[in-house]
Design a protein with these regions (language model features):
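A contiguous, surface-exposed recognition patch within enzymatic or periplasmic domains that forms
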Residues: 99, 192-197, 201-208, 286, ...
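Solvent-exposed N-terminal domain segments of exported/luminal and surface proteins
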Residues: 62, 66-223
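Extended, loop-rich substrate-binding clefts of extracytoplasmic carbohydrate-active enzymes
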Residues: 209-268, 385-400, 404
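Acidic, contiguous internal or C-terminal segments within carbohydrate-active enzymes
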Residues: 250-296
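Hydrophobic membrane-insertion alpha-helices, especially the h-region
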Residues: 2-12
Length: 549
């Protein structure tokens, strides 16, 4: 079931576009034809992916600081009205430009745990949009101690002439963790926490792209979105110099909710983050977004999206929403850059997983030697425990530039969020640097839409008819001869489809489905679903799409 919400762009409801000061660099955006059948429920084609288990992270000492302490702090804070206790920035750094802020560098030689662990921590100075103080503590042998601000840890360049006069309670804006991802001799950026509850994580051979969030509140709502902040962090010092899992805790706070978080980070080719969270609502909340992530999609291979004066064939950090439902069905929703705010919710129960995926890994499809969109990570969320009923919500926001995150995805619980009732959500998040090797069946590799030809329009007497072309590849499709009687199983809610064809492309070996879509009423929204079947067996994931884009 899909709930569709389409609205005019609402002032104040747009997504927060993470500022790129946290990164190594900035973005340096039917009459039915014989092939058409009613859409049955596709069978489960594989177990939930990826097959992973919670990270065996080292636990703090029984008498030491741990997740229960953060839960207690969050619960105590939720019992009181929200307060922003961050001290104002001193005049010397209160009005820094983006370029000035970028010039303030943490000295690598002063990194926390330098030469003591595989992990090192560098701190971000406050300034520019990152004006809130974040309290960062170190946990050693079970004891937590706040890290006191020291201006000598930073190279201010020409921005601050007398850094020694900055107050010692200035605090920090966030931090980043370094780890030898690529080679044993250099510690690369692994995970960054900077601004609100945003964080970014990398695996091997990946470049920063999309962003994860601790929590989303009322994203896309008419009253405007609320941005909770991670106000406090506790970084657990590794007890073994060769320890390969890092544990940290965080306290989240906002007008509506507080939260306690535990992150266990395991670096690798596919970096894995295990998240445990307990939320304490201060008041009833219209909509919570659990395991939220944001990304950028300006345009892809669809010619209908090429409305920009840009030489690059495609520009995006992610090109689709992928999900595996509680019944085992795999869904693929190509992303779009709509002309007005669009929100879709894919209803489900006990979801196996979802994520924003960068499926296209071919440099020639981007032609951007600076951005390297083919290296952007995909984030996949696998729930731990029973998340019950709810839905994966996809938010797509119009944008004319590739510097803004205009896509969001997250889980929305069906049960209302009520004051005083704690909520528990745990999940695994994976940062993939290449195309995930699931679903195991055929996958959508391209979606193209275009206006019907003049002849088709004349024959149909419908100027709003659209031609859809979908290419599938992978799984059992690759070994099929072109004479095999594959069927495209299609549904069109709000319209009908005609002129359906299925053919194997001789040059690529992929299978192409092509059809016309006619809205039931002129310019009405049409929800489409399609997958390929052979002798009653589903061979592909389910492609889902919405017109108009």
């Amino acid at each position: 079931m899909v709930i569709v919400l389409v609205a005019a762009f609402l002032a104040g409801s747009h997504l927060h576009a993470p500022v790129h000061a946290s990164l190594s660099a900035a973005r340096d955006a039917l009459t039915s034809a014989p092939a058409v059948q009613p859409l049955p429920q596709p069978p489960e084609v594989a177990p939930a992916a990826p097959a992973a288990v919670p990270i065996p992270a080292p636990a703090p000492a029984d008498s030491g600081f741990g997740f229960a302490d953060v839960e207690q702090l969050a619960q105590q804070r939720a019992a009181k009205p929200y307060e922003n206790n961050s001290p104002k920035l001193p005049p010397a750094i209160a009005k820094l430009s983006y370029e000035q802020y970028q010039s303030i560098r943490f000295k690598r030689s002063d990194a926390l745990w330098r030469n003591q662990s595989l992990f090192e921590v560098q701190l971000f100075h406050r300034g520019f949009n990152f004006d809130r103080r974040v309290v960062i503590s170190e946990v050693v042998d079970g004891q937590a101690k706040s890290i006191v601000y020291n201006p000598n840890w930073f190279d201010f360049g020409k921005v601050v002439r007398q850094p020694g006069k900055l107050p010692r309670d200035l605090g920090f804006a966030g931090f980043r963790v370094h780890y030898p991802l690529q080679t044993p001799t250099y510690k690369d950026e692994l995970i960054v926490f900077l601004g609100a509850s945003f964080f970014r994580v990398l695996g091997r051979n990946q470049d920063y792209g999309m962003t994860a969030r601790g929590l989303a509140v009322n994203t896309g709502s008419k009253g405007g979105e609320e941005f909770p902040w991670f106000t406090d962090f506790w970084l657990v010092k590794p007890t073994d110099p060769e320890q390969r899992v890092l544990t940290l805790y965080a306290l989240l706070d906002s007008d509506s909710v507080t939260g306690a978080y535990r992150f266990d980070v395991r670096p690798g080719r596919i970096t894995q983050v295990e998240v445990h969270s307990t939320l304490f609502p201060r008041r009833n909340i219209q909509k919570l977004g659990i395991a939220s992530m944001t990304s950028m999609f300006l345009y892809g291979e669809d010619p209908a999206g090429h409305r920009f004066n840009d030489y690059r064939p495609e520009v995006h950090d992610s090109d689709g929403l992928m999900a595996q439902t509680g019944t085992g069905e795999w869904l693929w929703r190509p992303l779009t850059n709509p002309r007005e705010l669009r929100i879709n919710r894919f209803m489900d129960e006990h979801p196996h997983g979802f994520g924003l995926i960068q499926r296209d890994r071919d440099f020639t499809h981007y032609q951007d030697e600076d951005a390297h969109f083919q290296r952007r990570p995909s984030y996949w969320v696998q729930p731990l425990g029973d998340w019950g009923r709810g839905g994966v919500e996809l938010v797509e926001i119009p944008t004319d530039e590739d510097i803004h995150d205009n896509v969001a995805a997250y889980w929305v619980p069906e049960q209302p969020v009520e004051t005083g009732k704690p909520l528990h959500y745990d999940w695994l998040m994976f940062a993939h640097g290449d195309s995930p090797q699931w679903p195991p069946g055929g996958k959508v590799i391209a979606t193209r839409t275009l206006a019907a030809t003049p002849d088709e329009v004349n024959d149909l007497d419908r100027s709003d008819a659209r031609r859809i072309v979908i290419d599938f590849a992978g799984g059992d499709l690759d070994g099929l001869d072109r004479t095999q009687p594959l069927k495209a199983l299609l549904t069109a809610n709000g319209g009908q489809v005609q002129d359906v064809t299925v053919e194997k492309l001789s040059e690529t070996g992929s299978w192409r489905v092509s059809f016309l879509v006619l809205p039931s009423r002129p310019h009405e929204t049409v929800d489409l679903h399609c997958y390929l079947q052979l002798y009653g067996e589903s061979l592909t994931e389910t492609w889902t799409y919405q017109l108009p884009t």
